[in-house]
Amino acid sequence: IFSFKRKNKKDPTLYSVRLLPIGGFCAMAGENEEDATDLKLKKNQYMCNRSKWERFLILIAGVTNNIILALIILFFQGLIWGSTEQKSIVGNAPEGYPVSEAGIEVGDVVTKVNGYKVNTWDKLTIVLNLKHKEDTYTFTVKKQNGDIKEYKITPKTVKAEDGTETKVFGIGASSEVHKGFFNAIKYSFVKLGSIVSSMWLTLASLFTGKLSLNNLAGPVGMYSIVGETMKVGLVNVLYLTAYLSINLAVINALPFPAFDGGRVFFILIEWIRGKKIDQKVEGYIHMIGFALLMLLMLYITFQDILRLFK
């Protein structure tokens, strides 16, 4: 839409506002040696001519800032509105549902589901949504008296108007709210660890086929999610912002071409080899990675649009 430079001549950075407000980016001068052609800049101002440490710090800055932003948001969420229990302690098990009928009670702690270790509600939710060949789920539970018991639970299947089916277990977290400055600090870090752990499990499950790509949401799907979230209050919008910021950090840290993590991976190879990788080769690899990401994004967006018309 428009761009500008600061009046300070020592700062040649070009700032711009783009047509689609879907995120921010930094385009460093001379990211590749072939791009280092601007004669107005000194050689040491090109990124490709900076030391390995400097390039490494620049590349992890985005991920680091995403994490810091999420921690700040989660802290203020916990400080102002308080936080609920993050550990996988059963806080709600209504009668007439599979979990309570199996014998699991409020206060029990779910430690495993189908062999997956769970210690937070975020991870428990992910595990319950993974593909499972059998109808029965195995819950390993630590009872309030310290005993460890296993329960075989078959969830109810509820069919929505659009034909989609949802598995219902009848289990929930405690609604008790904890407040206070130090509790807010604890909540922000515990929640960060919980979301990161759940994100890694999600990515691993996508590669192994235990989670379908149809479970992912693209720009169109996120627009709908944000719209629905705004209807239920500011606290949920803030949490969603922190959640997305952490997700972006995790994805960007992956050692995949075109991601910052992929570029860091090439710096690590450079450290090991003692010399730079051919810039053309690295450029082609990042180009292929970017093309694959665009294909994935198109597929996910197509699925988002199909869901809108169901």
Feature locations, PLM:
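Hydrophobic alpha-helical segments of integral membrane proteins
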Residues: 15-25, 29, 56, 60, ...
